Amino acid sequence: MSKSTIEPKNKKSVNRGKEIAKDTILTPNFYTTDFEAMEKMDLSINEDELEAICEEFRKDYNRHHFVRNKEFEGAADKLDPETRELFVDFLEGSCTSEFSGFLLYKELSKRIKDKNPLLAECFAHMARDEARHAGFLNKSMNDFGLQLDLGFLTANKDYTYFPPRSIFYATYISEKIGYWRYIAIFRHLEKNPEGKIFPLFNFFENWCQDENRHGDFFDALMKAQPRSVKSLSNKITIGGSTFTHPLFDYFHRFRYFLNNHPFVSKLWSRFFLLAVFATMYIRDQGTKKDFYSALGLDAREYDQFVINKTNETSARVFPVVLNVFDDSFYRRLDSIVENGKRLSEIDKKDNQNLNKVLSKIPIFISNGYQLLRLYLLKPLDSKDYQPSIR
């Protein structure tokens, strides 16, 4: 991707970058991880599958797919102000999310290329895809006289640290949920072309295949992880400061032993599935319903379809998945959405900050309770869940 596709071209683009640099729990985050642990990963258990996936990446099926055509000319001017605002918000979030993936994958490919070349090459190919997506979205923003300052975001947005295994869980789910989100929108608009508010959606069918291949890579990578890990690192980072001692190696061994224990793997599977599903559902139902309505979609039905399909797909790699069919699953998520509306109403009031905080405490407790109950729902064993997909 050429550098010009991600650089700001006007004053407005800089402002957009600064706005999105402000983190909230529902905005796309930027991530970093333990690069030393990543470069020491032994892939031999599943190297053949990883090599096959890397060969698929090398073919770059979408190399010539993301080419704008005449349909884009004047398309932005046809949108009414309300739909325009909704679509620009969608473009901002999507572009930031894709760029976040690019930064993580690119940094991984650079840091581990000397000691783990196969893994580094896979990450480099995925960084290529994510950069292409972000650049294409940013060009659509330019149709509206805006462009994200991705360079500003790179330098100023906070980075959240996750250990490698957590990155694998979260990114696998995110890539697979991205596939189902894009293909669901594409298929809907294929049957209901009157909802196609912008030509960008014509590209979603091939686009989602990139997401699917990325998810397959993380599937293969998780299968490649051994039950025991040799010397990992004698370093530990606390509050941004790095400390070195030989004993820290045993800490890392114990941590990796726990992460690879079957019982702990089940807990992590449930945690990350719930985290990704709840974030998407709460965001969409709380602030994105009008956008989906503009496409002719019912936001609740759309989210339920995407969550159910992603949950089903995740049964191929995780030992357990969430029981999304339990009557209380979406009911509890809806309760959190309603609590979000109550929080917004409190923020609109002219009360003093202390009164606002006190008013919010019961709502936060309610949200925590609902999430805990969702986490404690008896999961579905992947061996018994939709065996036809395995």
Swiss-Prot record:
Keywords from the UniProt entry:
Chlorophyll biosynthesis, Iron, Metal-binding, NADP, Oxidoreductase, Photosynthesis
Is the keyword Iron in the record?
yes
Kindly state a single biological-process term from the GO annotations of this entry: light-independent chlorophyll biosynthetic process
Q: Which domain of life is it from?
A: Bacteria
Q: What is its EC number?
A: 1.14.13.81
Top-level class of the enzyme under EC nomenclature: oxidoreductase
Q: Part of which pathway? A: Porphyrin-containing compound metabolism; chlorophyll biosynthesis (light-independent)
Q: Which GO molecular function entries does the Swiss-Prot or TrEMBL record give? A: iron ion binding; magnesium-protoporphyrin IX monomethyl ester (oxidative) cyclase activity
- Look up the record and name the cofactor or cofactors this protein needs: Fe cation
Q: Which reaction does it catalyse?
A: Mg-protoporphyrin IX 13-monomethyl ester + 3 NADPH + 3 O2 + 2 H(+) = 3,8-divinyl protochlorophyllide a + 3 NADP(+) + 5 H2O
Return the similarity comment.
Answer: Belongs to the AcsF family.
- Report the function annotation for this chain: Catalyzes the formation of the isocyclic ring in chlorophyll biosynthesis. Mediates the cyclase reaction, which results in the formation of divinylprotochlorophyllide (Pchlide) characteristic of all chlorophylls from magnesium-protoporphyrin IX 13-monomethyl ester (MgPMME).
HAMAP family named in the record: AcsF (MF_01840)
Q: What is this protein called?
A: Magnesium-protoporphyrin IX monomethyl ester [oxidative] cyclase
